């Protein structure tokens, strides 16, 4: 059983997303350690990219800031290596395929294994476009985590279930991340439909920004993914590290509503 699968064995999961290098890599280290200490179950570490198609304005801004700081995939691996012994929860790398191609697929997999990465999410790489890549990371003990949306067909769900492991990333709306105005009424039906074809845990993301929303949603899913709301806190408090870490603690603790 993978480290990610272990998380879901006895409990629901709180999954958070941070952009590596926002506001800088030193602070990213401290944010990850704080999230780990505060009981976050899985941490997604975003690889900044110049044209992040699935990301809303908040995460786009964080990406731009990180790129301006000279953040590269190599530096991200170096940073995560420095804290890998202290982080007890699974780390998942999330990024666009171009970043990985530029780094070199074999190099990426080697570094991911050495850094103790548990899973990989690539929003712009459908499972049927690069089957070899997903097979390779799986062979190396890394979970390929795929995305589905409310309009994903039954046929596609069946195929995705053969490739995906760890958890399935269920996008709650059609659009970009951070849309907290998305209607939530369809989520029960959505989770029931996906569960007919997929037998791994379902985590829901896009638009979760409050304990109330988390409570309403977690009933139907195995985990919640919080990204833009956390990135906003980082952006608003990046000048005061002490306050930033306190705010992260307050916010993440408030989201564990189960």
Curated annotation (Swiss-Prot):
The lineage of its organism: Bacteria, Thermotogati, Thermotogota, Thermotogae, Petrotogales. The alpha subunit is responsible for the aldol cleavage of indoleglycerol phosphate to indole and glyceraldehyde 3-phosphate. It comes from Petrotoga mobilis (strain DSM 10674 / SJ95). Gene3D superfamilies: Aldolase class I. Keywords: Amino-acid biosynthesis, Aromatic amino acid biosynthesis, Lyase, Tryptophan biosynthesis. It catalyses: (1S,2R)-1-C-(indol-3-yl)glycerol 3-phosphate + L-serine = D-glyceraldehyde 3-phosphate + L-tryptophan + H2O. Its EC number is 4.2.1.20. It comes from the Bacteria. One of its GO terms (cellular component) is cytosol. Pfam families: Trp_syntA. InterPro entries: Aldolase_TIM (IPR013785), RibuloseP-bd_barrel (IPR011060), Trp_synthase_alpha_AS (IPR018204), Trp_synthase_suA (IPR002028). Belongs to the TrpA family. CDD domains: Tryptophan_synthase_alpha. Tetramer of two alpha and two beta chains. The active site is at residues 44, 55. It is an enzyme of class 4 (lyase). Pathway: Amino-acid biosynthesis; L-tryptophan biosynthesis; L-tryptophan from chorismate: step 5/5. This is Tryptophan synthase alpha chain. One of its GO terms (molecular function) is tryptophan synthase activity.
